[in-house]
Amino acid sequence: MNTNNLLLENKKAKFNYFIEEKISCGIVLKGTEVKSIKAKKLSFNNSFASIKKEELWLENLHVSKYKEGNIFNHDELRPRKLLIKKRELQRLKKFKEKEGYTLIPISFYLKKSIIKVEVGICKGKKLYDKREILKQKSIKKDLSREIKYK
């Protein structure tokens, strides 16, 4: 994935989860949703992917209504179907069956003017893991300040 084509990234996912693996997949969108996503009007809060009837669905993704849209504007929180190969879906099912694993959208990006979603197979971090990461960040910041002022 090229960073120039990155539309939006879920920064909270890296803090709240251990990302085991990333999978790129397509997404079924309506016209006004495409325009809103390209304008970066979406929110990842509490969004996740689930497997229903041999299909992968993205749930709780908030895509704001397109400001130029009319009465045919989309529902903001509707479930969106993710397009993925059957083999990858079977592999995701195996991970999902394990205790503590979940599927989280990591980023939205453009690939040849088509919007793609990067979904991560994630395991939740405990509170002490998050505290350890914050402690390491503060130590790095203090060291860089000391080096800068010497």
Curated annotation (Swiss-Prot):
Keywords, alphabetical: Cytoplasm, RNA-binding
Localization per Swiss-Prot or TrEMBL: Cytoplasm
UniProt entry tagged with the keyword RNA-binding: yes
A GO cellular component annotation in the UniProt record: cytosol
Chief site of localization: cytoplasm
InterPro entries linked: SmpB (IPR023620), SsrA-bd_prot (IPR000037), SsrA-bd_prot_CS (IPR020081)
NCBIfam families: PRK05422.1, smpB
Xref: PANTHER family: SSRA-BINDING PROTEIN (PTHR30308:SF2), TMRNA-BINDING COMPONENT OF TRANS-TRANSLATION TAGGING COMPLEX (PTHR30308)
UniProt protein name: SsrA-binding protein
Organism of this sequence: Borreliella burgdorferi (strain ATCC 35210 / DSM 4680 / CIP 102532 / B31)
